Regions:
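Generic secondary-structure signature for well-ordered alpha-helical cores
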Residues: 28-32, 54, 85, 89-90, ...
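Glycine-rich phosphate-binding loop
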Residues: 47-84
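Glycine-rich phosphate/diphosphate-binding loop of Rossmann-like nucleotide-binding domains
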Residues: 1-36
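Short, acidic/small-residue loops that bind anionic groups at enzyme active sites
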Residues: 74-102, 120-121
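A charged, well-structured terminal subsegment
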Residues: 116-141
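Short beta-strand segments at enzyme active-site cores
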Residues: 36, 58-62, 94-100
C-alpha cells in the first residue's frame, strides 16, 4: 500500500481544512495510507517534506497565501514553490502542490471549494496528481 503524507499549512485554517478534506477523501477512496502534519505556514512545508522524504512514497502540500500590500506574497510563493519542486526532483518523489495563491480572500475560498458556486478544490487536484504519478499512469483516475 502506498503511503502519502499531507502537509497542511494552517495559517488560513478555515480555507485549508476544505483542502485537507478533499485530498483525504480522494486518497481513502484509492486505498492510500495517509498521515497528516500541520505546520504554521507555507514556508515550513519544504522542511517538513525533507524530514519525512524517506518515510513516504509521495506528498501533498496544502496551504494558502493571499496577496497583501508588501512583496511578502511573492517571496513566500517563489521560495516555497521552488523548494518543493527541487525536493521532488532531487528525491524522485511526487509532490502534489495544492497551495492556493490568491489575490484576495474570495479567490482563495473559490479555489478551496468552499463556495458552493465553484467546484474547484486544489486539495483534490493535488491528491489526484500524486496518485496518478504513483500509479505510473497505469490506472485511469
Amino acid at each position: 500500500m502506498k503511503k502519502i503524507l499531507i502537509i497542511n499549512a494552517n495559517y488560513y485554517n478555515d480555507i485549508t481544512q476544505n483542502l485537507v478534506k478533499a485530498s483525504t477523501t480522494f486518497c481513502k477512496k484509492r486505498k492510500i495510507s495517509l498521515s497528516i502534519i500541520n505546520v504554521p505556514g507555507v514556508f515550513e512545508i519544504p522542511i517538513c517534506i525533507r524530514k519525512n522524504v524517506k518515510k513516504f512514497d509521495g506528498f501533498i502540500a496544502l496551504g494558502c497565501v493571499i496577496k497583501g500590500q508588501t512583496p511578502h506574497f511573492d517571496l513566500i510563493c517563489n521560495s516555497s514553490f521552488n523548494a518543493i519542486m527541487n525536493l521532488s526532483i532531487t528525491f524522485n518523489k511526487p509532490i502534489g502542490n495544492g497551495i492556493i495563491t490568491a489575490l484576495n480572500r474570495k479567490q482563495a475560498l473559490e479555489r478551496s471549494g468552499k463556495l458552493k458556486s465553484n467546484k474547484i478544490n486544489k486539495g483534490f487536484e493535488a491528491a489526484k496528481a500524486v496518485i496518478s504519478i504513483l500509479e505510473n499512469g497505469t490506472k485511469k483516475i
